[in-house]
Amino acid sequence: MPRNAVNKSINTYSYDEVLKKSIAYFQGDELAASTWMNKYAMKDKKNNFLECTPDEMHWRMAKQFARKEKEYKLKSHSNASFKYLSKYGQERELLDEKKIFHYFKNFKYIIPQGSVMSSLGNPNIIASLSNCIVLPEIYDSYGGIFHTDQQLAQLFKRRCGVGIDISTLRPAGMLVSNAAGTTTGAVSFMERFSNTTREVAQNGRRGALMITIDIAHPDVEQFITVKQDLSKVTGANISIRLSDEFMNAVANDSNFTLRWP
């Protein structure tokens, strides 16, 4: 069947119709109704409403969770997915669509995070089901740095908040094999990551980035002070990863050696 024939059978709702029914659903709470409409109700690519109340959203999610439940139907160690379940997960009764909907209904027992409510089972948007993701360590090369930058752009496009750690990048002044001879250091690449965060926006909302560095990294002092210049790294929050070794040195008023790697 042609794609356009499928689309013609999909019900759409007017804004006023959805507003009226969602206000009734939330027992007169207009703020709750408008929040649900703006953030979580499924819409098509022309911004037409495809869901009229949270019940329809909950059925959409229940259908997708039930689909995943069926993957574990064969309760056997020969099932590759089975071994990743907890003991409870291996032994519990499988849930069907109706039972899952019961847990979602009226937001009584389970309220998923926002990205799940807006994105799960929604074919009209490209989005992640995780609100936040921590990327693996950055490979210490230009290729590795640009790869991480590309990952950031793709994740921000999908409305994820992202955390990265730059401790694997060599400190300023160390020898490198390129024409420059020495590296500008880990902190110098923060601006690139920050700019990507600001530039990739969804619905007027920029991405969210956390950059961390180990307290033992030789560039840590530069990292700490980089945002004293209010024009620098404006698209990211920054934090130091403290170690027991450092905290013991503080407690004992002893020396602490910076090092890389």
How should each PLM-predicted stretch be described?
Residues 1-261:
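Extended catalytic cores of very large enzyme megasubunits
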